[in-house]
Amino acid sequence: MSTGQTIYHSLLKLPLSVMVKSTPIPSNPIEDLNIDIERPIIYALPFRSHVDLLTLQKSAKELGLPDPLSPIEIDGVSYPRYVFTSIGPKMFDTDDDLPQESLDLFKIVLKHHADNPDADFQLIPTSILWGRRPGKEGTSRPHLMPLNGPQKFVTLIKAGRDSTVRISPVVSLRYMADNHGADDAIAHKLARVAKIHFSRQKLAASGPNLPNRQALFNRLLKSQAIEKVILEEARIRNVDVEKVRKEAMGIMEEIATNFSYSLIKNGNRILKWLWNRLYQGLNINNAATVRKLAQEGHEIVYVPCHRSHMDYLLLSYVLYHEGLVPPHIAAGINLNFFPAGPIFRRGGAFFIRRSFKGNRLYSTIFREYLAELFAKGYSVEYFSEGGRSRTGRLLQAKTGMLAMTVQAMLRGLNRPVTLVPVYIGYEHVMEVTTYAKELQGKRKEKENAGQVLRTLRKLRNFGQGYVNFGEPISLNHYLNEHAPNWSESINPIEPQKPEWMSPVVNGIANKMMTHINDAVAANALTLCATALLAARQRALSKEDLTEQLDCYLQLLRNIPYSNTATVPTQDAEALLEHAIALDKFVIEKDTLGEIISLDRNQSILMTYYRNNIIHLFALPSLIAKLVVQYRSISIDNVQAQIQQIYPFLKAELFLHYDESELNDVVSQHIDELVRQKLIERENDVLQLNATNILKVHLLAHTISETLQRYAIALTHLQASPKLGKNDLEEQSQIMAQRLSRLHGINAPEFFDKGVFGILFNTLKAEGYLNSDGVAVISKVEPFSRDMSRLLNPEIKLTIQAVMTKED
């Protein structure tokens, strides 16, 4: 570097230290992007800019990356550690050519790789984005615009403290040299690819141009689909067309978002304060997958689970901090109250009525609005379960929005549409007490400003929050596989509902929910809740609880549930101390040590957190339950019984294992339980290990309530084979409530009608009911007998007593 440049950089650093505050994305690039700091690194930037270079230097040093202004040695000669892909702006024009010094460096590096087979330099594309304000519809500025000196100065004043340093995945120059050669053409090709990459990166960060709201409404009113339904409604109602058109405009006003980047930017500061006040930390995983989809031009539809009203804010906040555009969010019309409604609307919410069946005008306008969002490239978010889960379990998917998404594809979208399942988890859900009251019969309180203020008064530290992005689902690939001729149904005007639509949408919905549960985040509270609720008196000594947590951690670490699930990195002792600090347990001391327990109210609330992760332990718990009940059981019998029960667990808990791989997975869990000395194996027979009897009983109890529900329903079917779905649900619910009261089962979902509904559907799908819904006794009877054997004696006696009374 010349002396002049050194002096110039020194002069720039002071004003930049005041004017610039940048956020690196990702926040931990060495780990997230697998950067090897032991291998040579060269940075590629889009434009020649000293300001960008110094901004990168500051971030690189903070992140533990090499200083871009430090030279790199190649064959004993020092060279710059950076290249620019274009000369960039001058005062009155822009030179888009690759700078000669960058071209020369590319050639030197590629030749070095050709001459040295062991060389493997890392090229890291890096761009500095000054602000993320989207453009306005009708403008044609490039997504990534070079700035001359005066423009850069103005930008620094406006957006210097709203800048991001975007660090992209490493490009291996060894790979480039081996596969593409080392001539001048490759250097130019690298520069061209980098320019496209940088432009897409900027689009992914700021999003498409925002429409003028009134122009959008006028455009929708002129669409053939809405115009047609307006004319038909006017004719059917025998009213003036203008009256219906005015009604249509009112519906658009009710639905449409009024997205404001200023609110997002300024609201981010408030949300940052809020999260710091509420949570000790936010844990975000797999965001790089989503960034990649955005940069590749996918239409992204976020489909998170729904635990709390906080989900709306949390996911938008996380996406903004991960360098992505906050999505347009489908929110229930119940949230459109003052002052929250207007704020949510400017934050990206568009509002949807709970039901609009039979309202053709509303349904057509909503469908056209959604199709417009997709066509313009705005990411969209809707909650897969429809409403918040009151039990902590993942609910069955509501398929209305998903069906409209597929219908939007049948309008002829020219970009791939991808669902991104999102698992959102908390160590404390603010509404959990309200949920428990609602499940016990209290009427749901309508959302209002007073409710918000009461919630704000309760703000305190709620432990950790978790946002895990699951495995994406390409709708194009899914349709190609399950409805190969789907493109024949494309119609740009009329909404289509071909024969394949319902089964395909149901299949996508099930896959979507399974991927959400795959991305589960186990945490200190969910694990402690699982252990304590399994204990007979909801109490364990501190030592026993620690050992049980360690048992769970070993299971989750040694047999990972999925590639997207996360497990705490701390040991059992640290997790327990963290959970105790959340102040949810009763802690008593005696001469033998500490006892940790749950009072009755907390026992009910803790079922919510256990239910977040119950699917993780479904199989190991079932294996333990079989061994506990049988005392001695062959592995073949274990495999056979699990094969019989598994379809019901899979449907209820969205487990991802195929039946074809089930035996292998069960074998892995058996091996792990034997390794932990929870059970013993001799000549392919499993039996209890007396030295670890408590641990295996606690593990077995996790699945017990689920098996009790199955036994209840099967007992009813066996006694009354012609019992219909509604009667089975009602009678099973009554018996479950009786069991709950008599045996202290505090889980509100134990007698949830919806869970029995899923069970009925699975019985039918698995052939336990014939086409008329009548029980096939030859199948139901042995299954009922097997389930009965897995019940504790007192539960079995209660079921028999209730059935005798009914007879």
From Swiss-Prot:
Q: Which CDD domains match?
A: LPLAT_DHAPAT-like
A single GO molecular function term of this UniProt record: glycerol-3-phosphate O-acyltransferase activity
Q: Which InterPro entries match?
A: GPAT/DHAPAT, GPAT/DHAPAT_C, GPAT/DHAPAT_LPLAT, GPAT_PlsB, Plipid/glycerol_acylTrfase
| UniProt signal peptide | none
Q: Major place of localization?
A: membrane
Enzyme Commission code: 2.3.1.15
What GO cellular component term, any one, is given? plasma membrane
How is this protein positioned relative to the membrane? Answer: Peripheral membrane protein
Q: Which UniProt keywords apply?
A: Acyltransferase, Cell inner membrane, Cell membrane, Lipid biosynthesis, Lipid metabolism, Membrane, Phospholipid biosynthesis, Phospholipid metabolism, Transferase
Residue ranges annotated as motif HXXXXD motif = 305-310
Tell me the HAMAP family matching this sequence: Glyc3P_acyltrans
Q: Which gene encodes it?
A: plsB
About its domains, the entry says: The HXXXXD motif is essential for acyltransferase activity and may constitute the binding site for the phosphate moiety of the glycerol-3-phosphate.
The entry assigns this protein to a family as follows: Belongs to the GPAT/DAPAT family.
- Top-rank lineage group of the source organism: Bacteria
Report which reactions are catalysed by this protein: sn-glycerol 3-phosphate + an acyl-CoA = a 1-acyl-sn-glycero-3-phosphate + CoA
One Pfam family for this entry, by name?
A: GPAT_C
Q: GO annotations under biological process?
A: CDP-diacylglycerol biosynthetic process; fatty acid metabolic process
The metabolic or biological pathway listed in the UniProt record of this protein is: Phospholipid metabolism; CDP-diacylglycerol biosynthesis; CDP-diacylglycerol from sn-glycerol 3-phosphate: step 1/3
Q: Output the SUPFAM superfamilies linked to this UniProt entry.
A: Glycerol-3-phosphate (1)-acyltransferase
Where does the UniProt annotation locate this protein?
Answer: Cell inner membrane
What protein am I looking at?
Answer: Glycerol-3-phosphate acyltransferase
